Amino acid sequence: MSLIEKLPDLNAVKGGFGERLAAYYSKTVFSDAYVLHDVLIDGKDEHKSQIDLIIIAASGIYVVEVKTFSDAKIYGDGRKRDWQYYLGGHRYDFYNPIMQNKKHVEYLKKMLSDFAKVEFYSVVLMLCDGCKVSNVNRSDRVDTVVCTSLPAMNRAMKMFLEANETKLSPADTRKIYDYIKENQEQGKEARRAHKEDVKAYRQKVQTERENRVCPYCKKPLVLRHGQYGNFYGCSGYPKCRYTEK
């Protein structure tokens, strides 16, 4: 059984938590930030993206994915499609939230393509009993963080704030906020269609797992023999270096 099948919808689990989180961070991290919660946007590729939290500040746009796993330990690799969730002596696989939020950022960038010089940051907040994650960023540029507590999230956002020399004007942050708010998908029908889309996408991911397909370039994975044992690697190597056990 996959974690996706075991757990209820995360939006239902969180309830009003996301709104409280948004209010908290709009006041304590960025005094001049605009905050949007539970935003549904059109990716222009027949898919939509539901974003838990968007913080629009002078230092850039922070796209936040919140995962709530009570009494569980999580292990993941930023380069791997599947992460592991351990609870009650059992292991469950679930889709890499770094990859998930990367898609959110990609869709939001498309939506805001008319706004130049905007920095985007991916923040994954894992509320769980323990979390060990490796290879969060795939290059020397750090634009993604995985946090396991609200204070850690606070520190990460401050790190981005201090490191970014490009600043948006108050007028620009307001324009971006208004644009997202006015152009987000709204209404029950849009939400229903998105749920059906997510269901189909999860089935697609499961099929790719079973058929050993690379999540990045969609080429077949092939069995390889390494120094530390056998593993599956992308047939597109060396252009694509995805591997899995």
What does each model-identified segment do?
Residues 1-50, 56-61, 67-70, 75, ...:
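Surface-exposed interaction regions that form or flank ligand-binding interfaces
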Residues 79-81:
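TOPRIM-like Mg2+-dependent DNA-processing core and adjacent phosphate-binding/basic surface
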